[in-house]
């Protein structure tokens, strides 16, 4: 297979006044479900566009591209075409979107997403300087493409152990996948199983209805790959059950059973689940009076009620939030964190959907 990367540039040489600001969505998402981490302020991205001038530079130098000059012939990820591919395959496209992404919180270097290339460095600098806001840009690292070998993953068990070589585990690009998260997920599973094997314990296998990692590994070992594999929600038939908000419920108990959580993390997990269950019971069992919710329903633009209705049923109405219902109907002094309220909202909406009901039944 083949893969590539775009150039990096010095953000101090970019005129951001000519670019479109792309702020993050916020939300305070965390990698860990077991601690209240300090989340640093998110840095925005910026959008610029590759137009006719850039396409002309690329076309004039196609013979110098490793991808088009015959040096690299492997198959690359279909969803991440190089700028050479975009120019050749979509000649009538008036322009191509380019994102400038900060490489980190404490650096001025920007990742030029959308311009993966194998052209020489001087050509890359030439086409970068055709972009709006980048006429004086300084390139800090050039993009490049590589060709690599992989092991057909049907040779692996669901533990990522090689069938013919007990004790040898493969993870990442060597299995035919592409992407950071794909590699990291395999590394977690391979590492856990290698440790369990040394300890003589049962293997750790995630099913397709338990985790996206389970979908990824099952696809690899049962179907194999004929192109670099990237995981999408569309590959998961249980995707309504595999959500960010319930990851701790799906995977936390498994991690606890295998000794992957500290005592502090275990207590945090159990406390979070207890809180979510307590809030869910309140919404399920509490009937709200018409006069209590009249203002909330009017603000949401939905019809009023004439008799008490359970909070969980009102929550299914558009633009009605769990926080609003808890505030107006909370005679018992029930408190709830933002995470617990979000879990109630998403869980009810997802679990009552036709597709979710069907797949749970199956």
Regions from the PLM with identified roles:
Residues 173-181, 237-239:
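Glycine-rich phosphate/pyrophosphate-binding beta-alpha loops
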Residues 1-10, 131-132, 136, 189-197:
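Glycine-rich loop(s) and the adjacent beta-strand/alpha-helix scaffold that form part
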Residues 1-100, 104:
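Rossmann-like dinucleotide-binding core of oxidoreductases
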Residues 183-206:
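Internal hydrophobic alpha-helix adjacent to the cofactor/substrate pocket in enzyme cavities
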Residues 14-30, 199-299:
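Acidic/histidine-rich catalytic neighborhood
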Residues 235, 247, 252-362:
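Extended, charge-enriched "interface" segments that sit outside catalytic cores
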């Amino acid at each position: 297979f083949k893969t590539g990367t775009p150039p990096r540039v010095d953000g101090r040489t970019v005129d951001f006044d000519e670019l479109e600001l792309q702020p993050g969505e916020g939300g305070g998402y965390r990698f860990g479900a077991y601690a209240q981490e300090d989340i640093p302020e998110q840095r925005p991205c910026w959008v610029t566009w590759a137009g006719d001038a850039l396409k002309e530079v690329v076309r004039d130098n196609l013979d110098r591209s490793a991808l088009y000059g015959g040096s690299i012939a492997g198959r690359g990820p279909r969803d991440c075409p190089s700028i050479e591919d975009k120019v050749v395959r979509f000649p009538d496209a008036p322009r191509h979107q380019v994102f400038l992404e900060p490489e980190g919180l404490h650096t001025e270097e920007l990742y030029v997403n959308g311009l993966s290339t194998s052209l020489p460095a001087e050509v890359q600098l030439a086409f970068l300087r055709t972009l709006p806001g980048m006429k004086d840009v300084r390139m800090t690292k050039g993009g490049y493409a590589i060709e690599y070998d992989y092991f057909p993953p049907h040779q692996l068990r669901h533990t990522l152990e090689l069938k013919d070589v007990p004790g040898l585990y493969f993870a990442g690009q060597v299995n035919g996948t592409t992407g950071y998260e794909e590699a990291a997920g395999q590394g977690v599973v391979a590492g856990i199983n290698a440790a369990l094997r040394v300890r003589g314990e049962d293997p750790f296998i995630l099913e397709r209805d338990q985790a996206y990692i389970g979908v990824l590994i099952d696809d690899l070992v049962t179907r194999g790959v004929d192109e670099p594999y990237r995981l999408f929600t569309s590959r998961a038939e249980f995707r309504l059950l595999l959500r960010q908000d319930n990851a701790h419920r799906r995977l936390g108990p498994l991690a606890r059973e295998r000794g992957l959580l500290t005592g502090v993390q275990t207590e945090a997990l159990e406390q979070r689940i207890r809180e979510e269950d307590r809030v869910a019971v309140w919404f399920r069992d509490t009937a709200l009076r018409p006069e209590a919710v009249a203002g909330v329903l009017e603000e949401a633009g939905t019809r009023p009620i004439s008799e008490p209705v359970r909070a969980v049923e009102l929550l299914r109405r558009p633009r009605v939030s769990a926080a609003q219902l808890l505030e107006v109907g909370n005679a018992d002094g029930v408190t709830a964190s933002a995470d617990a309220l979000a879990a109630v909202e998403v869980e009810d909406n997802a679990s009552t959907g036709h597709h979710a009901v069907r797949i749970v039944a199956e």
